[in-house]
Amino acid sequence: AYGTAKKSAYTGSASVIKADDIEGRMVTDALNALSGTMAGVQVSNASGGQPGTSPTVRIRGIGSIFGVSTPLYVVDGMPFDGDIATLNTMDIESMTVLKDAAAAALYGARGANGVILITTKRGKEGDATITFDARLGSNTRQIKGYETITDPAMYYEMAYNAMRNGYLATGSDAASAHLQANNALYDAFGKGYNIWTVPAGQLLIGTNGKLNPNASLGKVYGNNYVTPDNWYDGTFCNGLRQEYNLSVTGGSERFNFYGSVGYLKDEGIIKGSDYARLSSRIGVEYKAKKWLKLGSSIAYNHIKMNSPSGQDSGDYNSSANAFAIVDNIAPIYPLYVRNADGSFQRDAFTDNPIYDYGDGLYLRNSQRAFMSGANPASNFIYDKNEGLMDVLDAKWYATITPIENLNVTGTVGYFLDNTRWHILGNKFYGAFAKMGGYAQQNQSRLRGLNLQVLANYRKTFADIHHTDYMLGYESYDRNSESLSGMGLNLYMPDGWAINNTLNNAQRKTSGGSTTYTTRGIFGRVNYDYDSRYFASVSYRRDASSRFHPDHRWGNFFSVSLGWDAAKEAFLRDYSWIDLLKVKASYGQQGNDNLGLAYAPYYIDIYAIEGSETWADGNLAQKGNPDI
């Protein structure tokens, strides 16, 4: 972002992945294209299986124990605080990962965890070239569940033996333990369900610990028929991934352009989860004068996602987590409520099958021993967790060349992210049925303004002393706003708006606003002697609003050396050695990303509570002025 360098002359540690490698992978988030391609870069995805979820990226391990270890993302020279998944991977020319202090020290207070530079495509001189790309794929759960018991008969036999041994251990005789264990298989303190039809006067499990050979799977309870279902098949699916991109590029010696539109629909492995992205980008560059070049790059992306809540690894104990339910539920429980003839009972409004929550509501005296009141497959149909994003990323720049080898570039970058979430907990089934349903609206807006001035000068002395000088100034201002509201007791069953709730006393709202500002001046000097010996020195003085006014400025530097032994006389005759480089670097980096949700740690924070005209303020955080 702060200039370019040849690989042979570069003294820092960096790795690059080009467009061909990125496009060769069917990934929704460009960061997944880094997986397995670079030493020292770890890419891991959340376990929830939601399409469009950005992976966790760690460059040379964890950079902070208590702070955030996320690297800094820079898109076309400007810090990018949005979701990388909003970028169309087909618009990316290259991604460069800066790993060490020599490479990242120039980024000051934000570069401690490494830097990922993303360069988007630009126009190329020549006739207009139109490219259309269409891709189809499938998403499948690759990591299967643990080897568990899937046969209902085997499960009942093991459960019987465990209970029988328990009764024997507490003093029951063999006959009593046998009878007690059989009865306990069905009650609420055992497994809660009897899914077998056994002839009158007989027990399900014999004294030999095996299933009664006269038992048949399936049992009628009044108007209901009970039989186990495959929860895996009822919860997971193979999702279709489809992507279409159209781009046009071309230009002349003085003018070039690049434009693209794209559409992506990525269905998840959990029923009801998907991610849709409509993307567009246009970039132009015009050489107005021999000494003046103007350019701009504007991208607008619209995203719509359905993301069932409670599916991440941190929610594994949640009753909404499909992975937890499917991995742990016994193979004896029904997924659906059935009529006595075995057909599905259907919802009167949607005609969808009615799901069994294991709470005894439909199947009297049958209460599931595991996760009673939960059925994630039903939640995927009747609940809503819909996210909408509109993202604008725009840059305008001008480069002047007042004298030979001196370029001065001024850039203005503007970023806007409007995100809305519509959340609905249905009023008929599940956790929110007793409340009459639940509705929530969340809205957030993130705005960023970046101003940057860079001066680059190159000079060669005596044909072997190559020097490169860079001096720059950068300011970044970010503002984020959020507003959230929720209510209970829905009027319209499918309405997610708060004004669709009838219980005014239970309506709640919350909101907030934060600002974040950085200022920095920086410079770098590169020296190259005869393409054999290299040296680089960089310095940045940075200020961050996250620290106390007395401690906001910090100094960051790096020194690096390099030697390409392949250019020495004693190795020049070895044609199979084209680069043999030894590098060493030392530097200091900063990390102002402390994971602050609302306000800096250096100020006192009071929580305002109460619903009357006068409310109390309780001290929630005691500020530390030394930060």
Stretches with model-predicted labels:
Residues 10, 22, 59, 106-107, ...:
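Short clusters of hydrophobic/aromatic residues that line enzyme substrate/ligand-binding pockets
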Residues 1-281, 286-289, 293-295, 301, ...:
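Short, small/polar-rich motifs associated with maturation and membrane association
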Residues 184, 190, 195-249, 254-260, ...:
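Outer-membrane beta-barrel transmembrane strand signature
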Residues 54-58, 270-272, 307-308, 421, ...:
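Short secondary-structure transition/capping segments
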Residues 145, 149-211, 301-364, 477-493, ...:
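A surface-exposed, glycine/aromatic-enriched loop/edge motif typical of exported proteins
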Residues 21-24, 69-70, 277, 283-292, ...:
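Extracellular/periplasmic, surface-exposed regions of secreted and cell-surface proteins
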Residues 34, 39, 320, 328-331, ...:
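Proline-centered flexible-loop/turn and helix-kink motifs
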